Structure formats: structure tokens, C-alpha cells
A protein has these predicted regions:
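Conserved AMP-binding A3 loop
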Residues: 295
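C-terminal beta-strand-loop-alpha-helix "lid" module of Rossmann-like NAD(P)-dependent dehydrogenases
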Residues: 1-287, 292
């Protein structure tokens, strides 16, 4: 009788878990649609600021501090985007692993990595391993907004402009040295079944190259859709140098916001996949327990 009672309790608990997992799967599925829509809606703005920045940069010979590589960089800021909640499979593990690999590479080149983390799970991971964080933010991984990124990016830009030879106030109020480069570690959303941990150097800004092949007889500056077209000429007001000063920080904010949106979509997709698998396993165990109880 005791064994039968324990089996009934196990059946009840397994059925309850299966319902919870299935509910989480449905919630994640509904959120993916919204996350994908936000990512798609932001894409034209991100592309347009790249186009404008390219036009402005091409109209000036000024060497901007956000574009120039520094010799012998001593410190590099690493901003990692993780989730606030769990139950999303290997989502956080994969992005944290990519961060660890980046940190090892930086150390091999004599550069000290300085970690900044978005997301409660990433913060908990580094706190558990007694790893000091120069900055931490949480509470918006599923629904990031520009306002959420204002404080982190202002601090990171100040840190880069200060450089490793100077000091500035950290988000927690302590004094820390500046940095000579800024890296971003996040998750790229490819599909419902594929989310790729990604590392990007944000500052100094890396040039973006077009991978499309050039056809024979086509010039690098020509428009492949119209061989007679010419690049437009622009007149800037105020001048191109002043515009570049304003546009580069906005470009960086746009890139990080796009990464946060992709990470949110990736988190939803990873959670849906994990909960779907957990639901299937729960029902498999439930059927096994019920079969045993009927013997």
C-alpha cells in the first residue's frame, strides 16, 4: 500500500510538472512572435543609420577616437547579454562559454577583460564564481528598451574615451580604470531551432564588409542594379565632423539595442524548445508510472 501511495503521489507530481512545462512552452511561443516583430521593425532604422554614417564618414578625413585602434590595449570591457529567467536550455551556458573564450583570447594578447553583465542569470553565475563585475543590470531581458541601455552605454563610452590610463566612476560608485576596447557578447536569432552565441567588437568600430561577389565589369562603387547610377553627393549642416561625433554613439546604441532584441527572441525560442522537450519527457514518465500503477 505504501508503494502504491508513493506511486500515486509521483503520478500527480509528474502530471503537474507536465502542465507547467506545457504552459511555459505556450507562453514562450506567444512571446517569440512579438520579439521577432520588434526585431524586424528595428532593422530598417539600424540599416539607415549605417547608410547615413557611411555617407558622413566618407565626407571627412577626420580620425575619430571611436574608429581608431589603440596600440597595446591594456583593458577591454566585455558586455554580456544573458536572461533574467531560467528554463531556457543551454541559452545562458552558450553565451557565457563564448564570453569565457573571448576572455581567454584577450588574456593571451596581454589585455585584461573587464566584465559588464545584463541579465540576472549572468550576474548569478559570476557572483557564484566570485568574479568581480564592473557593472550589472537586470529586469529587462525579455522586453529591452532604449532607456534600459542608456546607463550601461553611457558608462562604457566614458570608459573607452577615458582609456586604460585614466579612471572613472563605476556604476556601483567605485573608481575603476578605463578601457581600450569594448566587446559585446550576445545571441543571434537564426530560427526557432538555431540561436548562435556571437561576439562583436563594438569599439573601435569594425568596418562592415559586403559579402556579395562583384561581377565582371562591375566597379566596387557602382550600384549592381543600375550600372549608370552614381553615388549621391551630400551637403552637411552642421559639418561632417560634428555630425560624426553625434552619429557614432547613436550607431553603437542602435547596434547594442538590436543585439538585445535578438537575444530576447533567442531566449524565447530556447525556452520554447526546452519546455517542449521537458513536456514530452514528463508525459513519457507519466505514462510509465500509470502503466506500473495499473499492473
Amino acid at each position: 500500500m505504501a508503494d502504491l501511495k508513493a506511486l500515486k503521489n509521483r503520478i500527480s507530481a509528474t502530471r503537474s510538472n507536465a502542465k507547467i512545462f506545457h504552459a511555459q512552452e505556450l507562453i514562450a511561443t506567444s512571446r517569440i512572435t512579438r520579439a521577432q516583430a520588434r526585431t524586424a521593425a528595428q532593422a530598417p532604422y539600424a540599416q539607415e543609420i549605417v547608410n547615413v554614417l557611411s555617407a558622413v564618414a566618407g565626407a571627412t578625413n577626420m580620425t575619430h577616437p571611436l574608429l581608431a585602434d589603440r596600440s597595446n590595449p591594456k583593458r577591454a570591457a566585455v558586455l554580456i547579454i544573458t536572461s533574467d529567467r531560467g528554463m531556457c536550455g543551454g541559452y545562458n551556458h552558450n553565451v557565457l562559454k563564448a564570453c569565457d573564450e573571448l576572455c581567454e583570447m584577450l588574456k593571451e594578447h596581454g589585455t585584461e577583460p573587464v566584465l559588464y553583465v545584463m541579465g540576472a542569470k549572468g550576474i548569478a553565475h559570476y557572483s557564484f564564481h566570485d568574479h568581480h563585475l564592473a557593472g550589472q543590470w537586470s529586469g529587462f531581458s525579455m522586453n529591452p528598451e532604449y532607456e534600459n541601455l542608456k546607463s550601461p552605454l553611457e558608462h562604457l563610452l566614458d570608459s573607452y574615451l577615458t582609456g586604460s590610463g585614466g579612471t572613472l566612476s563605476a556604476p556601483d560608485g567605485s573608481e575603476i580604470a578605463g578601457c581600450d576596447a569594448i566587446y559585446l557578447v550576445y545571441t543571434t536569432f537564426r530560427s526557432m531551432l538555431s540561436q548562435i552565441p556571437t561576439v562583436r567588437r563594438m569599439i573601435p568600430i569594425e568596418p562592415v564588409y559586403d559579402d556579395d561577389p562583384i561581377t565582371l565589369g562591375e566597379d566596387l562603387l557602382s550600384d549592381p542594379t543600375d550600372s549608370d547610377s552614381l553615388s549621391p553627393e551630400y551637403e552637411f549642416e552642421p559639418d561632417a565632423e560634428e555630425l560624426l561625433d553625434k552619429l557614432l554613439p547613436r550607431y553603437i546604441t542602435t547596434r547594442v539595442f538590436a543585439a538585445a532584441l535578438e537575444s530576447a527572441a533567442s531566449e524565447c525560442a530556447a525556452r520554447r524548445t526546452a519546455m517542449k522537450a521537458a513536456t514530452a519527457v514528463s508525459y513519457t514518465h507519466l505514462r510509465a508510472h500509470e502503466t506500473r500503477g495499473n499492473l
